[in-house]
């Protein structure tokens, strides 16, 4: 805002800035984490000096907000005012080098984009041509890829999911879990993609719920303590993202004991978790002991992966 006024010496009016918390990073599963997301966004807006803020209720993406969620959304702003006293300071981040550098860099990029749009005929022309939509949608695709590869974390969706949670019963607006947006009538211009970051993960979990059967995934942990814990945690997160039931273990003395425990637990998938050096010994033994009674997975990408594949395929052929 200040940069625009500096560039235009005739600027005589103060811009009115309104901020609204995002829906893009909201999630259906573990929905109360949405409170932390929206509170962080509201605080950022207050620090930036906006004139007004709208905090979205944490349950907005899957149902009509109730009295509780709307009251909490209002109170989130009151916390910033009455307990953090963000209304008492004109510019709370003034003097913070990293905040001001980041702010200036964002403002410079935004100004360049603004000028590019104006040079092409203005915002209306750019929207009708689909240029704005293409740029926004490309950004959405890039961020979704970051979520899919866990370079961007959404707690409860692609990291530390609660696999025991069932969401189908609480979803009132059926389109929300996989979309997050809507339309009325036939579009006459290219549309914006309003889908949220967690939408694909939620669709995967909903498919598991609708199937009526929750696969059990057994962590066969053995050998090197540090490596088996790291790989069992990664594998548990991986399968829990699909809503599969995770059966974790403290470790087994022998592969055979682990396999029998997995079969006794009724596991459909057995994940061997150990170190790269030990996989050459444990993987063939576990695969042989399992004898096709469940799907067999080796956690990680060990250097001996090609040798293991050849050995396991040879065993199948035999």
Located regions from the model:
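Short glycine/threonine-rich loop-to-helix capping motif typified by GTGT followed
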Residues: 22-35, 63-73, 98-113, 132-147, ...
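Conserved phosphate/anionic-ligand binding catalytic regions in large, soluble enzymes, centered on
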Residues: 35-55, 59, 122-123, 226-234
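Conserved small/polar residues in nucleotide/adenosyl-binding loops
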Residues: 1-8, 313-318
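Flexible, glycine/charged-enriched surface loops at secondary-structure junctions
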Residues: 7-16, 52, 83-93, 119-130, ...
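Generic long, charged, amphipathic alpha-helical segments
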Residues: 220-221, 227-234, 238-267
């Amino acid at each position: 805002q200040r940069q625009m006024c500096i560039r235009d010496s005739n600027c005589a009016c103060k811009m009115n800035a309104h901020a609204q918390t995002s829906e893009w990073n909201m999630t259906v599963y573990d929905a109360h984490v949405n409170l932390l997301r929206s509170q962080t966004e509201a605080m950022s807006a207050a620090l930036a000096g906006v004139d007004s803020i709208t905090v979205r209720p944490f349950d907005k993406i899957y149902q009509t907000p109730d009295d509780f969620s709307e009251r909490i959304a209002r109170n989130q702003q009151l916390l910033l005012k009455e307990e953090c006293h963000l209304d008492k300071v004109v510019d709370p981040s003034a003097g913070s080098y990293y905040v001001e550098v980041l702010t200036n860099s964002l403002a410079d990029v935004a100004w360049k984009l603004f000028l590019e749009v104006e040079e092409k005929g203005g915002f209306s022309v750019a929207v009708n041509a689909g240029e704005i939509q293409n740029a926004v949608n490309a950004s959405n695709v890039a961020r979704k890829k970051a979520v899919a590869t866990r370079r961007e974390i959404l707690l409860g969706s692609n990291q530390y999911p609660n696999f025991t949670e069932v969401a189908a019963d609480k979803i009132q607006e059926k389109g929300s879990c996989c979309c997050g947006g809507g339309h009325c009538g036939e579009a006459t211009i290219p549309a914006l993609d309003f889908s949220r970051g967690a939408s694909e993960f939620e669709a995967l979990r909903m498919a598991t719920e609708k199937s009526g059967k929750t696969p059990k995934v057994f962590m066969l942990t053995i050998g090197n303590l540090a490596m088996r814990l790291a790989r069992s945690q990664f594998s548990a997160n991986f399968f829990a993202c699909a809503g599969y039931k995770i059966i974790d273990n403290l470790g087994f003395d022998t592969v055979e004991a682990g396999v029998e425990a997995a079969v006794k637990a009724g596991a459909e998938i057995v994940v061997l978790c150990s170190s790269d050096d030990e996989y050459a010994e444990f993987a063939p033994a576990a695969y042989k002991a399992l004898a096709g009674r469940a799907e067999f997975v080796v956690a990680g990408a060990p250097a001996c992966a090609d040798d293991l594949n050849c050995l396991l395929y040879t065993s199948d052929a035999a």
